[in-house]
Amino acid sequence: HVVPFTEIQLEINEKCPHDCITIIMRRFMMRIAEQLAKNNNCTALITGENMGQVASQTMQSLYVTNASVSMPVFRPLIGMDKTEIIEIARKIGTFETSILPYEDCCTVFVAKHPKTKPVLQKIIEYEKKLDEDAMIKKAVETTELIIAGK
């Protein structure tokens, strides 16, 4: 699934504290993923997160991210180091794609000093400035499905 996320990023960037935009974007990504999973009769989410690689992957950040969804979230790479992950990527043929240059939400909307220990209640308060339901609905409705190998 390719989810159009730019409008959500712009609104979060405009209405929320800059040091919290990364975690709020992650929470929106999880909510969108959860809705897409439900639409496809899936009962869990799987991510490629690894503990401590970036600010959004601290224990406290993962807790705040998880709190945005009700589905179980599996993170099979959580305890691996970067070398192990690269080795797996090479084995399954995704490494070359993973190193291609591109701009994503983490590079375009990066906070200079992102929160590494976000407080859930504060994040929820910031999110009240956003029309969460409408934003997620639009993103899900305009998602493009790409079948690998076709």
What are these regions (language model features)?
Residues 9-10, 15-87, 91-92, 138-144:
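Active-site adenylate/phosphate-handling loop in enzymes that bind or generate adenylated species
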Residues 3-6, 47-48, 76, 99-100, ...:
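Generic beta-strand/beta-sheet core signal
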Residues 1-15, 102-104:
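A conserved beta-strand->alpha-helix junction
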Residues 42, 58, 62-71, 92-150:
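Peripheral terminal appendages
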Residues 1-2, 74-80, 112-118:
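Short, exposed beta-strand "edge-strand" segments with a Pro/Gly-rich flavor and a Y/T-containing core
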